[in-house]
Regions:
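A detector for short, charged/polar N-terminal pre-domain segments
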Residues: 1-4, 134-136
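Extended, polar beta-sheet/loop recognition surfaces of beta-rich domains
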Residues: 142-146
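A solvent-exposed, acidic/Ser-Thr-rich amphipathic alpha-helical stretch
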Residues: 5-6, 11, 24-83, 89-90, ...
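Short beta-strand edge/turn micro-motifs at domain boundaries
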Residues: 105-136
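Beta-strand elements of well-folded, non-transmembrane domains
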Residues: 93-97, 112
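Short helix-adjacent coil turns
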Residues: 15, 22-23
């Protein structure tokens, strides 16, 4: 890895640290003011303030005590311009600090921009890993509505 790739990956490490501490303000501080955050179920949370308030509610509610878990090998870091990086990595979460929950594995895509001497996330997408042929999330059971 180059120094610049390591700078970008350090931001992802800081995001994980903030998540694991349940600190919504620290988590959101790594996003640009106009960032887009697309959840695993396709909802877009536009803007820094929305990302912070949504994560505060999550960290105080259903994701209290959850921890991020890396997975899927080394993250891929690609610079599309010197000040724009795309990172694709794997990951998941454990609830209440336990073992990773089957069916929560994701492919994570980040677009980071360098501004004011540091890297910030301009766009993020969390895509759950699934088996489209079976309609079942990998490691999980078939889920239906109703």
């Amino acid at each position: 890895m180059t120094d610049r790739q390591n700078e970008v990956l350090a931001v992802l490490g800081e995001l994980a640290d903030a998540w694991n501490a349940g600190d919504a303000a620290a988590y959101a501080s790594h996003f640009t003011e106009d960032a887009d955050y697309v959840t695993f179920f396709g909802m877009n949370m536009p803007g820094h303030a929305t990302i912070e308030s949504a994560h505060r509610a999550l960290f105080e509610g259903p994701l209290r005590g959850s921890k991020l878990v890396s997975g899927g090998g080394e993250p891929k870091v690609r610079f599309v311009r010197p000040d724009v990086a795309i990172v694709v990595s794997g990951g998941g979460s454990s609830l209440s600090g336990g073992e990773p929950v089957p069916g929560r594995e994701s492919t994570l895509t980040y677009v980071l921009v360098e501004e004011s001497g540091g890297w910030r996330v301009a766009s993020f997408q969390n895509t759950r890993v699934s088996d489209p042929a079976a309609g079942v999330p990998m490691g999980g059971e078939r889920r239906t509505l109703g």
